[in-house]
Amino acid sequence: MAGKAAAPGTAVLLVTANVGSLFDDPENLQKNWLREFYQVLHTHKPHFMALHCQEFGGKNYEASMSHVDKFVKELLSSDAMKEYNRARVYLDENYKSQEHFTALGSFYFLHESLKNIYQFDFKAKKYKKVTGKEIYSDTLESTPMLEKEKFPQDYFPECKWSRKGFIRTRWCIADCAFDLVNIHLFHDASNLVAWETSPSVYSGVRHKALGYVLDRIIDQRFEKVSYFVFGDFNFRLDSKSVVETLCTKATMQTVRAADTNEVVKLIFRESDNDRKVVLQLEKKLFDYFNQDVFRDNNGTALLEFDKELSVFKDRLYELDISFPPSYPYSEDSSQGEQYMNTRCPAWCDRILMSLSAKELVLKSESEEKVATYDHIGPNVCMGDHKPVFLAFRIAPGAGKPHAHVHKCCVVQ
């Protein structure tokens, strides 16, 4: 039986995971990853579980097809999942189509004790009862049970296509209707460019893309419901402010390319102390001498530089972060806590929600802690991103006042 008998309501587990690394080293990383994932499942015993993956299939999807199949089969048939008798899996495998491919994978699992679960058909505009296990992987564009979009080409930096977009599904559980949106936003192409301005040019691109998604999911085409948006937002710390703080007493040396005079490296040295190098910055190098600053007290001293969400504070809510930056961890399977020196560590992987969804998460009749927001595999190599999860319970009756509106019981 999922959930503890003493805790009423429906237990929900939302997980986001950028899994690109898993398919580059499946032998070592997948076993670790699945073990840690199942552990979280065992601890929280959800009735409904959603796993949103980005970069599914890794850097080279075609070469990873067999690993993808194996991963999906393992998830669906493992002992840890045997009580989940209904599942929906949506994999964007259309890697040959530049204008459509997002490399997103969305997995939804329903516990056998959960009754009357409905999923929305966006074409028919009605809810359908969820039965059995189904996998969709060819052209998700024609699947009526979801909406998938890649961002318009002019949203992409320099209009260069990359695998960024979103997938939306809608569910009705315990008379509560809500959207679950899997999202992957744009990364920082260059540490040097990110450092130039505050906020960075990349943060502006992400802001525009996230605004686009939020506008799409509350537009006039469908009834408005609560929503959870979780994925790899690629949110970064404000680079200029972070560097100023980490290097307060340092002097900066600029290295330029001989032929173009372009800045290729910044070196920050202490004024005394034998002019010790504190930080080296290149396009894809962020080499700070003391990584502990990102781990001590879970890096929370750096949260003041995590500003990208503040623009959306009237539309999106997030529980307090008490876990270290989720990216970029070493991909060496023997290194579980080490960051790579490619980027400034940041909380890229997040679970955000609409203000009405916040009420759903925090509404509880008891005083006990109702929600857990944390990362998975703190001491184990999970690839370059640590998955992040939110576990909560939908309180009994939370959706009752709206049940007639959602027409969840009007099923085809």
Curated annotation (Swiss-Prot):
It is an enzyme of class 3 (hydrolase). Isoprenylation at Cys-409 is required for localization at the membrane. GO terms for biological process: negative regulation of phospholipase C-activating G protein-coupled receptor signaling pathway; phosphatidylinositol dephosphorylation. Keywords: Cell membrane, Cell projection, Hydrolase, Lipoprotein, Membrane, Prenylation. It is a lipid-anchor. One of its GO terms (molecular function) is inositol-polyphosphate 5-phosphatase activity. Residues 410-412 form a propeptide. It catalyses: 1D-myo-inositol 1,4,5-trisphosphate + H2O = 1D-myo-inositol 1,4-bisphosphate + phosphate; 1D-myo-inositol 1,3,4,5-tetrakisphosphate + H2O = 1D-myo-inositol 1,3,4-trisphosphate + phosphate. Expressed at high levels in cerebellar Purkinje cells (at protein level). Expressed in Sertoli cells of the testis. Signal peptide: none annotated. Disruption phenotype: Genetic deletion causes a perinatal lethal phenotype in most mutant mice. A small percentage of mutants thrive and have a phenotype characterized by an ataxic gait and progressive Purkinje cell degeneration. Purkinje cell death is spatially patterned with surviving Purkinje cells appearing normal and maintaining molecular layer morphology. Phosphatase activity toward phosphoinositol substrates is reduced in the mutant relative to wild-type littermates. One of its GO terms (cellular component) is dendrite. A lipid is attached at C409 (S-farnesyl cysteine). Its EC number is 3.1.3.56. It is found in: Cell membrane; Cell projection, Dendrite. It comes from the Eukaryota. It holds the Pfam family Exo_endo_phos2. SMART domains: IPPc. InterPro entries: Endo/exonu/phosph_ase_sf, INPP5A, IPPc. Phosphatase that specifically hydrolyzes the 5-phosphate of inositol 1,4,5-trisphosphate to inositol 1,4-bisphosphate, and inositol 1,3,4,5-tetrasphosphate to inositol 1,3,4-trisphosphate. Plays a crucial role in the survival of cerebellar Purkinje cells. Belongs to the inositol 1,4,5-trisphosphate 5-phosphatase type I family. This is Inositol polyphosphate-5-phosphatase A. The gene is Inpp5a.
